[in-house]
């Protein structure tokens, strides 16, 4: 998994946005993908969303939240949006850095390679903050190993779609978000592991602003091959996905 996975040799246009409604960001992705197919640049969107659940194509009915989940007394219910990405259901919201790479992939297409590069970029960001993470075989995303009586915990989720050799959707890194919202769903369809954040693991507040630049650099380097994909010890063979 060396060398660039992109079909273009031009730089990636990184756009660091603020809080963007999910449906607005989804349409932005589609517009950028159309532009990329027409010869436009590769783009990386980095942003946050107001609280929302997004359900991938493989989401089962029992994995969804109930008709209303307020999270806290008096809070507004959280919408559920059905999407065309892979994977199952997850939550997005304040304190979580979401990245949408709109990238033209080189031939032959290798979506697994692409996902591994996204994982590698986030593993590096976590390591640079002093947090060891890795992969779990059979499950996408970035994980904290089990230990000290605690199960494996997902710190970053990945769900993508590739159409016309162009990527949409992407990754979500939990920085300083409210993890309670995950309790209303079966996150990513996985019931035997937990969800965590940089702040929860490092014992200090790690905001989106602190990691956004590092994530942009790491993702661009991983896609271009400057950050090679490596094996990370501690992964186990998952019993289910």
Curated annotation (Swiss-Prot):
The active site is at residue 188. PANTHER family: LIPOYLTRANSFERASE 2, MITOCHONDRIAL-RELATED, OCTANOYLTRANSFERASE. GO terms for cellular component: cytoplasm. The record marks 154 as: Lowers pKa of active site Cys. Keywords: Acyltransferase, Cytoplasm, Transferase. One of its GO terms (molecular function) is lipoyl(octanoyl) transferase activity. This is Octanoyltransferase. It comes from the Bacteria. It holds the Pfam family LplA-B_cat. One of its GO terms (biological process) is protein modification process. It is found in: Cytoplasm.
